């Protein structure tokens, strides 16, 4: 889907999501003079099945889809991405996609760490966890650590980056975003507070997170220490 006129801003949802999950950004971006492009990643919602099977895809396949959308609709002024969509966006940039400014909400900055969490939740031991990694690496055609944003960012020439993340997020560790911010020249990390066990998804509706993303896209980034704090339990620090 597409709305508005002006420099394109792409909305990229996360794993198991759909384009509507970032719909809250559409109206303010259009009002700010941007053309907004949103789409479903392979095997998600209304998109065609991925190469693996219906309902299954990989970060690299999603990266190919993002690169194809940017090639079709024009170089991005910015990309707003959530969760796995953030990793795939940087992978697309390593392929030459012009991604512009990046706003990443609860990104999976280190996919091996996510695999550790998955294995722990399901009670998998070291052998099964190692087997899962080998299968994933075979599917994506590269070592899993090469999907880490600290690795792919360098290959993408470190586009301007704003990370927004909550320490309560159980699905994508905040610590990974801290490491990405430390390793990515010029990157900024805004930390929300108090979003609870559903932080990975609540951040998509967090008023200050949305405002910070819009300001960053429009080159109006504010100091995190003076961000408006209408709700002390959900503030930036």
Map each language-model feature to its residues.
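Active-site glycine-rich loops that stabilize anionic/oxyanionic intermediates
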Residues: 6, 14-17
């Amino acid at each position: 889907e597409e709305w508005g006129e002006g420099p394109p801003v792409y909305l990229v949802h996360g794993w198991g999501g759909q384009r509507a999950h970032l719909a809250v950004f559409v109206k303010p971006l259009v009002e700010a003079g941007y053309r907004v492009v949103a789409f479903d990643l392979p095997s998600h919602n209304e998109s065609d099945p991925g190469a693996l099977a219906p309902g299954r895809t990989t970060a690299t396949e999603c990266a190919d889809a993002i690169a194809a959308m940017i090639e079709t609709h024009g170089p991005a002024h910015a990309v707003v991405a959530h969760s796995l969509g953030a990793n795939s966006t940087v992978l697309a940039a390593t392929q030459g996609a012009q991604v512009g400014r990046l706003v990443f909400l609860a990104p999976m900055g280190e996919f091996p760490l996510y695999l550790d969490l998955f294995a722990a939740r399901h009670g998998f031991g070291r052998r099964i966890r190692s087997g899962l990694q080998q299968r994933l690496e075979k599917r994506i055609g590269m070592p899993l650590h090469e999907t880490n944003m600290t690795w792919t960012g360098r290959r993408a020439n470190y586009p301007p980056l704003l990370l927004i993340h909550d320490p309560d997020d159980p699905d994508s560790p905040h610590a990974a975003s801290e490491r990405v911010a430390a390793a990515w020249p010029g990157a900024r990390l805004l930390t929300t507070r108090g979003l609870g066990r559903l932080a990975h998804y609540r951040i998509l509706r967090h008023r200050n997170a949305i405002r910070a993303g819009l300001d960053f896209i429009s080159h109006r980034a504010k100091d995190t220490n003076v961000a408006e704090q209408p709700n002390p339990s959900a503030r930036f620090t």
